[in-house]
Amino acid sequence: MPNRGAHFSISRRKDFLMDFSERVFCGHLTPDHTGRRVLLAGWVDAFRDHGGLLFIHLRDRNGIIQIVFSPEAASADVYRQAASLRAEYCVAVQGEVRKRLPGTENPHIETGDIEVFVSELTVLSESEALPFAISDKAMVAGASSAGADHVNEDLRMQYRYLDIRRPAMQKNLILRHRISQCVREFLDSRGFVEVETPVLTMSTPEGARDYLVPSRIHPRSFYALPQSPQLFKQLLMIGGMERYFQLARCFRDEDLRPNRQPEFTQLDIEASFIDEEFLYELIEELTVRMFAIGGIALSRPFPRMTYAEAMDTTGSDRPDLRFGLRMADVTGVFSRTSYSIFKQILQRGGSIKGINIKGQSEKLSKNVLQNEYAKEIAPSFGAKGMTWMRAEEGKLESNIVQFFSADELEALKRVFQVEDGDVLIMVADPSCAIVNSALGQLRLHLGNRLGLIPEGVFYPVWITEFPLFEPTDEGGVTSSHHPFTAPDRTDFDPGNIEELLSLRSRAYDLVVNGEELGGGSIRINDREVQRRIFAALGLTEEDVKNKFGFFLRAFDFAAPPHGGLALGMDRVVSMILQTPSIREVIAFPKNRSAACPLTGAPSEVKREQLAELGLLNLGDKDVLPGDAEKEDRIDHLSWVSRIGIAEGERPVMESILAQAEELAAQVGDLAGNEEPVRSVAPVANRVREGLEAVRLSFSGTGRLLKNAPAVKGDYFKVAGILD
């Protein structure tokens, strides 16, 4: 077996003594270096043998340079060793920088006008065959290149250290570093002090589940990893720090989505003796500077929109304002309608809203509107139906236009400013929330389908005046943001639900292109107001004392007026780099299942560790964590794939799994330095040959929902993690 460690004898030249202090970065070479001898070190990115000349792309963090091995510059020994190099070998070379011959320049790399003719070579470390391609640069103009863009993401994360070698990933991490430096420098210039807050803290209700850490010293007691530094940053204001910030690590045990991770970084900011305008100005200036690092120019001031306006016109409190398709309320148009569906909805206190899709009648045919949108797409967004009309020759036409009066049709044309070629869609429902939600999702769906959302455009907006409380199913209220947000007025009755739901908060969210980048609020600094907020939430004095006693005690010592905001840095960087997921801007992220394919976390622990932490016999269950019997693998396969496997199919599935294990073992034995071979197997059903897929009726959902991870009513409930 070849030695995989670093070795230096392969150069067979005693005069090549490496002094890495003299090293030049590959990407820093320019035509000004022509004629100079340089020492380079990095990884073999790509290899090309031209029979007598060997061309290699050498890559380090700063870029790629082409190095050349020729009989004229290199000895026979060096040339022979160079011929044995493979992808991702780590090497050091010394040679002369030369300009490339006319016509051989490579526009794919920044150093494409020059190359280095190598005279000395040392292999620092060898690499096994790669699980996926790392190189993403073509060696010659016009050639294609293969990267890791289409590699299974879990495979990339299993070998994340290799994935990080890719220039695209390194660029992401370097730009993230520069954005973090920008944050620190800017906030320091504005008098903010960076302070670290505890990671092991107390569990407090903040909207998501806590990650709990057992204490060995205090058996059966637990720390909680912070969902945010909310209470500590307010305590810093009471402590007189006045202006605080932190790039804080936060942890939330919640369902994953493309822009969520169980652990994430947020820019946490808090300041005393300020108001909303101070924070608007501060965050706008910082946001402009951060986006400028990615070459994106934002104009100031950012527009502002109340929560009510955002919901009324876009159906979302995270509005994407890069395109039109604003919603309009036409409830009044149909106040005396004879159309029975609308009439019944209005009699139940409902509402009717619509959107004018300007000039899109050719793309939205009657068939598309009726059979796709009215029957399938709108119901999938929660609407019970959708009404549509097309404007042609000065008239509105649809399959139900005959049910509306001439006055109603004329009123619609006025409200929506209808012109020929326009398409109207309307949603009606007894619930205004359903109307807003369904029509808002239709707005986004149509914007994407019709290509109305411009690329490379960034539209920031402040959303303000959120409701302070939201109703609960039990008839009470819960905080829209968190219970420390200041209300717009303090003379409220904590027992009057109707009054509580009318309160507005002094909260604000920063939204860009339909995505919330952060949010905050002016905080409560009066102990009595804070107590009444807790009372409105149904917390007893005992609850408050147990959960927030230490916090409220601080209010007895003169808390200053204060407020703050937190920005999700993973989201900010992802948006600036325009990546499909925040996982692309995190060095070692968790996957869609909140697991780490690289380390295998989370993992079981030994019974002895559980005993040391006092976690044995906490409940009455016989099976303990880390002590469970192995789960039947067919049942497990059935559950994770959401495919029902009949008892008669189990032997076939066992055979397939056994064959897969045997093949994996054979492949493992063959692993070596060979280049990987890829092939795509044809789609085939080995277990249920000859069976055709059939559409099941929803009248009986037992079979349909057999393997659902969770069921609510007749619905298959899954985590919102699909990209």
Curated annotation (Swiss-Prot):
Residue positions binding ATP: 252-254, 261, 516, 568-571
A GO BP annotation: aspartyl-tRNA aminoacylation
The UniProt record lists the keyword Protein biosynthesis: yes
Keyword check for Protein biosynthesis: yes
First-listed, main subcellular location of the protein, grouped into a coarse class: cytoplasm
E.C. numbers: 6.1.1.23
Localization terms from the record: Cytoplasm
Keywords of this entry: Aminoacyl-tRNA synthetase, ATP-binding, Cytoplasm, Ligase, Nucleotide-binding, Protein biosynthesis
EC top class named in words: ligase
One example GO MF annotation: aspartate-tRNA ligase activity
Pfam families, A to Z: GAD, tRNA-synt_2, tRNA_anti-codon
Residues carrying the site annotation Important for tRNA non-discrimination: 50, 103
Reaction catalysed by this enzyme: tRNA(Asx) + L-aspartate + ATP = L-aspartyl-tRNA(Asx) + AMP + diphosphate
SUPFAM superfamilies found in the cross-reference section: Class II aaRS and biotin synthetases, GAD domain-like, Nucleic acid-binding proteins
Residues binding L-aspartate: 206, 252, 481, 523
Region feature (Aspartate): 230-233
GO cellular component: cytoplasm
Physiological role: Aspartyl-tRNA synthetase with relaxed tRNA specificity since it is able to aspartylate not only its cognate tRNA(Asp) but also tRNA(Asn). Reaction proceeds in two steps: L-aspartate is first activated by ATP to form Asp-AMP and then transferred to the acceptor end of tRNA(Asp/Asn).
Oligomeric and partner information: Homodimer.
Family per similarity comment: Belongs to the class-II aminoacyl-tRNA synthetase family. Type 1 subfamily.
The protein's name: Aspartate--tRNA(Asp/Asn) ligase 1
Record organism: Syntrophus aciditrophicus (strain SB)
